[in-house]
Amino acid sequence: MKTYHQKPTEVQRDWYVIDASGKVLGRLATQISTLLRGKHKPTFTPSIDGGDFVIVVNAEKIVLTGRKPDQKIYYRHTGYPGGIKATPYKMMLAKHPDRILRLAVKRMLPKNRMGRRLLSKLRIYAGPNHPHAAQQPKPYIPRW
């Protein structure tokens, strides 16, 4: 029996909507990255973008466990000498709640063109509303 390789023209994409309220950040991010890559499908092919579109609502209500809300710090660098910037989790949650989940998912995807294309299929909204009703997204309940 030959190994099946999916072709880009054979990909069937679905839209899923996930409610992030009360969900743990890392556990939710793993589920989202699996959906984006298409690893939940029996036709998964590593070199083909066969994943689905994911809409996340209520990103501002995401949860971290333990002392991480007080201790977690996000680092970035401007590119200039001495240009390292640190942003605590609580400040990031107040200003950019969608960026927290986007960074967690981005770091779980491949670090190449495929990963950037997969990340473009992720739509994150801080509140409960989203403008993608025309795509008729199916509700997705994460396992954890």
UniProtKB/Swiss-Prot annotation:
The UniProt record lists the keyword Ribonucleoprotein: yes
Swiss-Prot/TrEMBL keywords: Ribonucleoprotein, Ribosomal protein
Alphabetical list of SUPFAM superfamilies matching this protein: Ribosomal protein L13 (SSF52161)
Pfam family membership, one: Ribosomal_L13
HAMAP family per record: Ribosomal_uL13
Quaternary state and interactors: Part of the 50S ribosomal subunit.
Protein's job: This protein is one of the early assembly proteins of the 50S ribosomal subunit, although it is not seen to bind rRNA by itself. It is important during the early stages of 50S assembly.
Protein name per UniProt: Large ribosomal subunit protein uL13
Gene this chain is encoded by: rplM
